[in-house]
Amino acid sequence: MIIATADFQHAQHGVAAVRAGKDAYIEKPLAHTMSDAQNIRRAVLETGKVVQVGTQRRSAANYQRAKDFIASGEFGDIVSVEMTWNVNQPGRWRRPALVEKLREEDTDWKLFLGNLPFEAFDPRKYIEYRLFWPYSSGIPDQWMVHQIDTVHWFTGLPHPRSVTANGGIYLWRDGRKNWDTMTAVFDYGPLNDATKGFQVVYSSRQTNSAGDVKELYHSNGGTLDLDKNLITGEGGLEESYGKAMGMKANQLRSRALLEKSGGVDSGAHAGVDEATSGNVRNWMECVRSRKMPNAHIEAGYSHSVALCMTIAAIQSGERVTFDDAKQQVVAGGALWPRL
């Protein structure tokens, strides 16, 4: 079963699918609340069904090569990561003509709401759900999870140690509630050793496309550019600066990460790219072999934790952490969401 419904429905439909004995491909985000994340994770582990999450970078050759390169040790310790996803598309996630035509009798509104509190029918929330919480968080649900998932994959870390976020609706004041511009800052590292780690800065805007989609991993020796698929010494320690401190130059040898990119198209009507088709193919192969797929349930759970932390940072304005014992998000020192 392929589940590509509204963001808030993914986990609920996934639970129903695996409990009914079906293997499932579940689009991202796996879940944007911790209760849904825990429910789908439990259901998959208890049923043993093959579940692939739609974070398709895990099935792209260039990202797989990047993971191997970092694991080899040649790159050195990650010191920072920069991620962007910028578009300039006023109609992104908008369907005004269809909204105008839709009537409640054309839908099963109560079924659509699932486990959300009841509210009166709203055609915008049915069709343009990505613009409205709690149906979606917008940018974090749709785009951030793709990119932050690579951090977990490349490092083996389960989730951020902390998240802060800022942003707003700065241009597209069309009745939406989810931000059109945001920046989130993540602290990553061993959960039991605060002396080690690195920062991830994620920024996204829907108001100007300069910068496009980028993921830049930095070490003291250089940069891993997953947009250009290059390993370079850019930013690495130069001899002139290291010499005064008794240090040698540390600059990576520049070369291509992979001859051919398996990247992801950020367009609104991109069709099927190599990464997506590869992710579906990997799932189908694992349905036959019963092996663990590339974007397995634990990967989905990890990106859901990072997503829930980010949503809490957006909604609370607080610094957000994660209570591993309780498997709950903490904002400003208290469990989130507030009861």
Task: Please report, for each region that a protein language model flagged, where it lies by residue.
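A generic secondary-structure signal
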Residues: 69-72, 150
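Contiguous beta-strand/loop segments that form the cofactor/metal-binding neighborhood of enzyme cores
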Residues: 64-65, 77, 82-86, 91-236, ...
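Beta-strand-loop-alpha-helix segment that lines the small-molecule cofactor/substrate pocket
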Residues: 6, 11-59, 73, 317
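N-terminal Rossmann-like NAD(P) cofactor-binding module of classical short-chain dehydrogenase/reductase
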Residues: 1-3
